Amino acid sequence: VRSRRQRQMCIRDRYGLVDIAKNKPVEEQSLFRIFSMTKPITAVAVMTLHDQGMLKLDDEVSKYIPEFSNTQVYKNFDGKHTSEPQKKQLTIRHLLTHTSGIPYGWEWSYVDSIYNFKQHMRKDWTIEEMTKDIATIPLKFQPGTQYNYGLGIDVAGYIVEVVSGMKLDAYFKSAIFDPLGMDDTRFYVPKEKQDRLAELYTRDENDKLIVLEDNAIKQGIGADGPPKLLLGGAGLVSSLSDYEKFCRMLLKKGEFYGKRVLSERAAEIVMTNQNPDGYKGYPGMGHGLSGTVNLESGEYSWGGAAKTSFWINPTHDLIVICYTQLFSKPTEYAQEFKAAVDRAIIVIDSD
């Protein structure tokens, strides 16, 4: 866990083990699969291209991926599965705010059932092949009309490749990782760093911790190079100190120790609400680009499937990051830690 406020490190602690069988403790430079905490990095990559005038958030996706020009929208008419044209064309903004109608396939709907059947993230293909296949599936709803967590940000990752002319990993490195000194963040773990990678756990039917053996989920274990499928929504491995640098850049409005990664306006767009209807199921919350926004405090946050979490609070000049590697039902440890930090700030500010 780590907490930084007003340029001061407040909390910097490590607890537990990264490998239970080897009794190996968490170290400062331990590496973690961050899963969906990849999404804000993809959003920043898109906004660096926006800053260069190479794309706009309200550009139609079909401008960069022509296959989406004919993508239909699912419509259930009198119990029959039909489709209709897009009333408002799908845009990059829709992709980054989960209002695209491109789901993961986790819910009970006809379109979700197609995604669940296809299992896109388990395929041996490139992000180009995956994206063009997605374009053949009807959107779950008309773009911009609903919120549904899904693969839209992976499609945005492919747009980064199309616009930049670079593979996603290379563009991340050039535009974000190198300027921020994020030397341990990438889509795979090279051989010389394999011993720093935390094991990924789940729980069995008796609630006992066991190693997760699903290699399709255990990303970042390949030692020979990046995977064929570079997912802008879930693919990165990172250290806590690396991700703190990314958060500090956003907190400081796109700048990191004199290096400007994003314009102030672009950083503001990332961390402010882009959904007029807010964040589905969470009163008082909105959604920025690839992250939630507290509509009262302006706090920007997100997390990953293995129970990693971060918060950036511009009002209190605060960053909080929590990492673990537990792929199971939701846990409250990160929220409890964050709540304790918030209570401490109230006490400090009242003195």
Task: Kindly give the residue locations of the regions a language model identified.
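Short, surface-exposed loop or secondary-structure junction motifs
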Residues: 72-296
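Short, well-ordered beta-strand elements
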Residues: 317-327
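Short, gly/Ser/Thr-rich active-site loops of penicillin-recognizing serine hydrolases
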Residues: 252-256, 266-278, 329-351
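Hydrophobic (often cysteine-bearing) scaffold residues that line and stabilize catalytic clefts
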Residues: 34, 38, 42, 152, ...
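Short active-site loop at a secondary-structure junction
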Residues: 21-94, 141-149, 231-234
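Single conserved hydrophobic/aromatic residue that forms the stacking wall/gate
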Residues: 1-7, 11
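A short, polar/charged loop-to-alpha-helix boundary motif
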Residues: 18-29, 329-339
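Short, surface-exposed beta-strand/loop micro-motifs that present aromatic residues
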Residues: 307-316
